[in-house]
Amino acid sequence: MKKRIFVPTTSGSDWQRLLAKPKLHWKSGRSAMSTAACWESCSPNLPPEIVDVLAASKDSALMNLELLAAIPEWEVQLPGGDRPSQTDVLALTRNDAGMVVLGVEAKVDEEFGPTLGTKRAAASPGQQDRLTFLENQLDCPSK
């Protein structure tokens, strides 16, 4: 696991070394490089696409968020895997209601993947462990 010491970036290229497979995933027009460019160009604010999604929720706790820190490729230990999962961007934010932590999965033109029902039907034992763990953490059991 990487150290939990964070160094501010000077450009999007600083994000490349944090990828699980930097040479494979760092390509123009793909999600990793596009995400870095988007967040870097918006700093110190949240990207407008994120603001719009949160505004659509109509939840006042998700409105007028101030970005405190954006951490690229945040590693999350989940059961059932042989390596940590990586969140594209972990954003620490706040507003008058308090602190909000956002986990962002960024996509350019890729699919998010199969639905949970489809994934569960073909899940390996490790994937099943992860799904069950997340369902329990989010208090949303599949049954």
Predicted feature locations:
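Nuclease-adjacent, charged terminal/linker segments that flank catalytic cores
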Residues: 1-79, 84
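Generic hydrophobic, helix-prone segments enriched in Leu/Val/Ile
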Residues: 67-70, 100, 131-138
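Short glycine-rich, polar/acidic loop-and-turn segments at beta strand-coil junctions
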Residues: 72, 93-95, 108
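Short, well-structured alpha-helical interface segments that form or flank functional binding sites
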Residues: 82-87, 99, 143
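Conserved beta-strand->loop/alpha-helix structural units within folded catalytic cores of enzymes
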Residues: 86-90, 106
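Active-site beta-strand-loop-beta-strand hairpin of nuclease catalytic cores
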Residues: 91-103
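Short loop/turn segments at strand-loop or loop-helix junctions that form parts
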Residues: 103-110, 138
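Acidic, metal/cofactor-coordinating or nucleic-acid-engaging core segments within structured domains
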Residues: 112-143
